[in-house]
Protein backbone atom coordinates (compact mmCIF):
# COMPACT_ATOMS: atom_id res chain seq x y z
CA UNK A 1 0.00 0.00 0.00
CA UNK A 2 2.87 2.40 0.71
CA UNK A 3 4.57 1.80 -2.63
CA UNK A 4 1.91 3.53 -4.76
CA UNK A 5 2.02 6.53 -2.41
CA UNK A 6 5.82 6.61 -2.63
CA UNK A 7 5.60 6.28 -6.41
CA UNK A 8 3.05 9.09 -6.55
CA UNK A 9 5.26 11.31 -4.44
CA UNK A 10 8.16 10.56 -6.69
CA UNK A 11 6.11 11.45 -9.74
CA UNK A 12 4.95 14.64 -8.02
CA UNK A 13 8.52 15.44 -7.05
CA UNK A 14 9.70 14.94 -10.61
CA UNK A 15 6.93 17.20 -11.89
CA UNK A 16 7.77 19.82 -9.27
CA UNK A 17 11.46 19.80 -10.17
CA UNK A 18 10.60 20.11 -13.86
CA UNK A 19 8.21 22.98 -13.16
CA UNK A 20 10.75 24.77 -10.98
CA UNK A 21 13.54 24.53 -13.55
CA UNK A 22 11.16 25.64 -16.31
CA UNK A 23 10.17 28.62 -14.16
CA UNK A 24 13.83 29.65 -13.87
CA UNK A 25 14.25 29.39 -17.63
CA UNK A 26 11.04 31.27 -18.35
CA UNK A 27 10.94 34.33 -16.15
CA UNK A 28 12.36 33.48 -12.73
CA UNK A 29 15.41 35.63 -13.33
CA UNK A 30 14.83 39.35 -13.16
CA UNK A 31 17.62 41.83 -13.77
CA UNK A 32 20.18 39.04 -13.80
CA UNK A 33 19.16 37.83 -10.34
CA UNK A 34 17.31 34.68 -9.44
CA UNK A 35 14.12 35.52 -7.55
CA UNK A 36 13.18 32.45 -5.53
CA UNK A 37 9.69 33.75 -4.69
CA UNK A 38 8.99 34.43 -8.37
CA UNK A 39 10.29 30.98 -9.31
CA UNK A 40 7.99 29.31 -6.77
CA UNK A 41 5.02 31.34 -8.00
CA UNK A 42 5.74 30.61 -11.68
CA UNK A 43 6.23 26.90 -10.92
CA UNK A 44 3.01 26.72 -8.93
CA UNK A 45 4.76 25.40 -5.82
CA UNK A 46 5.35 26.74 -2.34
CA UNK A 47 8.71 28.12 -1.32
CA UNK A 48 9.01 25.18 1.08
CA UNK A 49 8.64 22.80 -1.86
CA UNK A 50 11.12 24.84 -3.89
CA UNK A 51 13.72 24.72 -1.11
CA UNK A 52 13.11 21.02 -0.46
CA UNK A 53 14.27 20.30 -4.01
CA UNK A 54 16.82 23.10 -4.33
CA UNK A 55 18.25 24.07 -0.95
CA UNK A 56 20.25 26.94 -2.41
CA UNK A 57 20.11 29.42 -5.24
CA UNK A 58 23.33 27.89 -6.53
CA UNK A 59 21.79 24.41 -6.81
CA UNK A 60 18.79 25.81 -8.67
CA UNK A 61 20.89 27.86 -11.07
CA UNK A 62 23.09 24.84 -11.72
CA UNK A 63 20.05 22.71 -12.57
CA UNK A 64 18.74 25.39 -14.93
CA UNK A 65 22.12 25.80 -16.63
CA UNK A 66 22.33 22.04 -17.01
CA UNK A 67 18.90 22.00 -18.68
CA UNK A 68 19.76 24.89 -21.02
CA UNK A 69 23.00 23.20 -22.03
CA UNK A 70 21.18 19.92 -22.67
CA UNK A 71 18.80 21.84 -24.95
CA UNK A 72 21.79 23.40 -26.71
CA UNK A 73 23.42 20.00 -27.15
CA UNK A 74 20.25 18.66 -28.74
CA UNK A 75 20.19 21.54 -31.23
CA UNK A 76 23.85 21.06 -32.09
CA UNK A 77 23.35 17.31 -32.49
CA UNK A 78 20.56 17.96 -34.99
CA UNK A 79 22.90 20.14 -37.09
CA UNK A 80 25.06 17.13 -38.06
CA UNK A 81 28.12 19.35 -38.23
CA UNK A 82 30.35 16.45 -39.28
CA UNK A 83 28.85 16.70 -42.78
CA UNK A 84 30.12 20.26 -43.38
CA UNK A 85 33.65 21.54 -43.96
CA UNK A 86 35.02 22.84 -40.62
CA UNK A 87 34.63 26.58 -41.36
CA UNK A 88 31.00 26.09 -42.43
CA UNK A 89 30.34 23.78 -39.48
CA UNK A 90 31.85 26.33 -37.12
CA UNK A 91 29.62 29.07 -38.49
CA UNK A 92 26.55 26.87 -38.03
CA UNK A 93 27.68 25.84 -34.54
CA UNK A 94 28.16 29.48 -33.52
CA UNK A 95 24.81 30.49 -34.97
CA UNK A 96 22.98 27.72 -33.12
CA UNK A 97 24.88 28.33 -29.90
CA UNK A 98 24.26 32.06 -30.11
CA UNK A 99 20.51 31.51 -30.32
CA UNK A 100 20.69 29.59 -27.05
CA UNK A 101 22.97 32.13 -25.35
CA UNK A 102 20.58 34.89 -26.40
CA UNK A 103 17.54 32.91 -25.27
CA UNK A 104 19.06 32.29 -21.84
CA UNK A 105 21.16 35.43 -21.38
CA UNK A 106 19.52 36.20 -18.02
CA UNK A 107 20.38 32.70 -16.84
CA UNK A 108 24.01 33.20 -17.85
CA UNK A 109 24.11 36.48 -15.94
CA UNK A 110 22.71 34.79 -12.83
CA UNK A 111 25.06 31.83 -13.27
CA UNK A 112 28.14 34.04 -13.35
CA UNK A 113 27.05 35.40 -9.97
CA UNK A 114 25.89 32.16 -8.36
CA UNK A 115 28.35 29.57 -9.68
CA UNK A 116 32.13 29.40 -9.42
CA UNK A 117 33.80 29.97 -12.80
CA UNK A 118 35.22 26.46 -12.85
CA UNK A 119 31.80 24.94 -12.26
CA UNK A 120 30.19 27.03 -14.98
CA UNK A 121 32.92 25.96 -17.40
CA UNK A 122 32.47 22.31 -16.36
CA UNK A 123 28.74 22.50 -17.03
CA UNK A 124 29.56 23.74 -20.53
CA UNK A 125 31.89 20.76 -20.99
CA UNK A 126 29.82 18.90 -23.59
CA UNK A 127 29.50 21.98 -25.82
CA UNK A 128 33.15 22.88 -25.33
CA UNK A 129 33.97 19.30 -26.30
CA UNK A 130 32.05 19.71 -29.54
CA UNK A 131 33.90 22.94 -30.27
CA UNK A 132 37.19 21.18 -29.52
CA UNK A 133 36.32 18.32 -31.90
CA UNK A 134 35.39 20.80 -34.60
CA UNK A 135 38.65 22.75 -34.20
CA UNK A 136 40.69 19.54 -34.27
CA UNK A 137 38.92 18.45 -37.45
CA UNK A 138 39.69 21.85 -38.97
CA UNK A 139 43.35 21.45 -38.03
CA UNK A 140 43.51 18.02 -39.63
CA UNK A 141 42.09 19.25 -42.93
CA UNK A 142 44.26 22.39 -42.93
CA UNK A 143 41.43 24.89 -42.39
CA UNK A 144 42.42 25.98 -38.89
CA UNK A 145 45.67 27.10 -37.37
CA UNK A 146 47.97 24.80 -35.43
CA UNK A 147 50.27 27.37 -33.81
CA UNK A 148 47.97 28.00 -30.83
CA UNK A 149 46.72 25.39 -28.38
CA UNK A 150 43.29 23.92 -28.92
CA UNK A 151 42.43 24.71 -25.30
CA UNK A 152 43.17 28.39 -25.93
CA UNK A 153 41.08 28.47 -29.09
CA UNK A 154 38.13 26.77 -27.37
CA UNK A 155 38.39 29.18 -24.42
CA UNK A 156 38.51 32.10 -26.86
CA UNK A 157 35.34 30.92 -28.61
CA UNK A 158 33.56 30.38 -25.27
CA UNK A 159 34.58 33.80 -23.99
CA UNK A 160 33.65 35.54 -27.22
CA UNK A 161 30.18 34.03 -27.18
CA UNK A 162 29.50 35.20 -23.66
CA UNK A 163 31.08 38.60 -24.22
CA UNK A 164 28.64 39.06 -27.10
CA UNK A 165 25.80 38.36 -24.66
CA UNK A 166 27.12 41.10 -22.39
CA UNK A 167 27.39 43.51 -25.32
CA UNK A 168 23.80 42.75 -26.32
CA UNK A 169 22.68 43.25 -22.73
CA UNK A 170 24.48 46.63 -22.64
CA UNK A 171 22.83 47.68 -25.92
CA UNK A 172 26.09 47.89 -27.88
CA UNK A 173 25.35 44.93 -30.16
CA UNK A 174 22.14 43.84 -31.82
CA UNK A 175 21.00 40.37 -30.73
CA UNK A 176 19.90 39.73 -34.31
CA UNK A 177 23.41 40.41 -35.65
CA UNK A 178 25.44 38.91 -32.81
CA UNK A 179 25.75 35.40 -34.28
CA UNK A 180 27.23 36.70 -37.52
CA UNK A 181 29.48 39.13 -35.62
CA UNK A 182 30.78 36.25 -33.49
CA UNK A 183 31.49 34.12 -36.56
CA UNK A 184 33.12 37.04 -38.38
CA UNK A 185 35.39 37.54 -35.37
CA UNK A 186 36.10 33.90 -34.57
CA UNK A 187 36.75 32.48 -38.04
CA UNK A 188 39.78 34.74 -38.71
CA UNK A 189 41.15 33.82 -35.28
CA UNK A 190 40.94 30.13 -36.17
CA UNK A 191 41.99 30.23 -39.82
CA UNK A 192 45.40 29.00 -40.81
CA UNK A 193 47.68 31.85 -41.89
Model-flagged regions — what are they?
Residues 60-68:
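Alpha-helical DNA-contacting segments of helix-turn-helix folds
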Residues 84-111, 121-125, 129-133:
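Helical hydrophobic small-molecule/effector-binding pocket
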Residues 108-113, 121, 125, 140-184:
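Hydrophobic/aromatic-rich alpha-helical bundle segments in the mid-to-C-terminal region
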Residues 1-42, 59:
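Basic, helix-initiating cap at the start of DNA-binding domains
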Residues 63, 74-103, 116, 179:
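Hydrophobic alpha-helical connector segments
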Residues 44-54:
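Short hydrophobic/aromatic patch on the recognition helix
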Amino acid sequence: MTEPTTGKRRADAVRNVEAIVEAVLNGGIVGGELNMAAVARLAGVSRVTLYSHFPSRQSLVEAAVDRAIAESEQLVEELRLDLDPPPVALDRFVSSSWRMVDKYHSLYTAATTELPTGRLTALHGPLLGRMRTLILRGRRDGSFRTDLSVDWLVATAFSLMHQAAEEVEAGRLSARKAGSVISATLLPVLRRE
